[in-house]
A protein has these predicted regions:
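Sensor-1/coupling segment of RecA-like P-loop NTPase cores
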Residues: 154-191
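Alpha-helix termini
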Residues: 121-124, 160-171, 223-228, 326-334
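Residue-level recognition of the N-termini of beta-strands and the immediately preceding loop/turn
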Residues: 129, 174-177, 339-343
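Well-ordered alpha-helical segments embedded in enzymatic catalytic cores
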Residues: 113, 117, 149, 153-156, ...
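Extended, compositionally biased accessory segments flanking or bridging domains
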Residues: 1-149
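Conserved nucleotide-binding/hydrolysis micro-motifs of P-loop NTPases
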Residues: 41-44, 136-139, 184-188, 207-211
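AAA+ P-loop ATPase motor domain of ring mechanoenzymes
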Residues: 2-21, 25, 29-37, 83-87, ...
């Protein structure tokens, strides 16, 4: 998708769609017993419902995508809290797990508890479910032998017999999938990941222009100055927010929106708020009186160092003066409105 509003269309026509990793997940559920997610997994994502679009954390968005494939239950595990059922869930699922001797809570937090529970979870016949290993890069620390033993147990569980589906769950994937949430793809050892046909890798990208624009609209209620804007100005400001937030997560946009309102920038000053958030200071060096004074003396300073190149000095001073005085856009708050390029000095 293009990041240029000229290509993407007017702000009012931008449309948020389901995250791109949804389609990759749907395919992987049909072909792989385990799926490894890396990338921007700690962000917010659009969830499309009949009442509109909501932006939810990854786990909630994952649960919606699994439900669309007939997987109603999500059992999550992390090294601190152990096994738990991701809400909302059917009460019957918790009862079925208890009947199979699967301990929820901190009792299943360690590698031994996970090793004991996984074969029963992945072979659960009563209802299709998925197992999410959150913070999977931290499952076993400091003991390569224990880590390898756990991975071998996981591999055996994934390759074990698939549960027998009842007719009511015939549309669900044949296997209960195991889902990894990793910091980086290299967190799984090479011997386990390379050539493993049961493992599918999915990288979650940063939000694109449409997602940022849609979330900017979601955040518009944060700003008090939107009450004085008409529809055209509001759309332009939201588009500016989306463009300025290029490279940011949606969670970062939410943080910046709260910062902009607290600092008195409002939506109209969102570009300045983002500039401050990116560089970590309110100071703008292009507004410095000392900088302007140095540019005013720039010809004298350059002429003392560069001999016989008056034309080069003239052109250099023109660029610097336009940058500082506001004619080139180099000091403009808006990043996407600035000219881009480099000035090389050679000789």
């Amino acid at each position: 998708r293009s990041e240029d509003p000229q290509d993407a269309g007017a702000a009012g026509r931008l449309r948020v769609v389901a995250p791109s990793w949804h389609e990759a997940l749907s395919c992987a559920l049909s072909t792989a017993g385990q799926i490894a997610f890396t990338g921007n997994t700690r962000d917010l994502f659009p969830v499309l419902r009949s009442g509109g679009c909501r932006f939810l954390p990854f786990e909630d968005c994952l649960r919606e995508a699994l439900a669309a494939r007939g997987i109603a239950g999500l059992v999550r595990h992390d090294p601190v809290d152990g096994l738990s059922l991701s809400p909302p869930h059917e009460p019957a699922l918790g009862e079925a797990l208890a009947a199979r001797g699967i301990r929820l809570g901190q009792g299943g937090a360690g590698p031994q508890g996970l090793r004991a529970a996984l074969p029963r979870l992945l072979g659960e016949p009563e209802a299709p479910l998925a197992v999410l290993l959150d913070y999977a890069s931290r499952l076993v620390q400091g003991d390569p032998g224990a880590r390898d033993a756990l991975l071998v147990a996981i591999d055996k569980a994934v390759r074990g017999p698939a549960p027998r589906r009842t007719r009511a769950h015939a549309d669900a994937p044949r296997r209960n999938p195991l889902i990894w949430m990793l910091d980086t793809p290299g967190d799984l050892p090479e011997w386990f990941a390379v050539g493993n046909e049961t493992l599918s890798h999915i990288s979650v990208p940063m939000p694109d222009l449409e997602e940022r624009f849609g979330f900017a609209g979601e955040l518009s209620g944060t700003f008090s100055d939107v009450l004085a804007m008409d529809a055209r100005e509001l759309a332009a400001r939201l588009e500016e927010f989306a463009l300025e937030a290029d490279g940011m997560t949606l969670s970062g946009m939410r943080t910046v929106a709260a910062f902009a309102e607290a600092e008195g920038h409002g939506l109209a000053g969102i570009a300045e708020a983002i500039r401050t958030w990116r560089i970590g200071t309110r100071r703008n060096p292009w507004k410095s009186s000392l900088m302007r004074a140095r540019v005013a003396r720039g010809r004298e300073m350059l002429a003392a160092r560069v001999q016989g190149q008056d034309d080069a000095i003239d052109r250099t001073m023109a660029i610097l003066e336009r940058s500082v005085m506001g004619l080139s856009g180099a000091q403009i708050r808006s990043r996407h409105a600035r000219p881009r390029g480099l000035l090389f000095f050679a000789g």
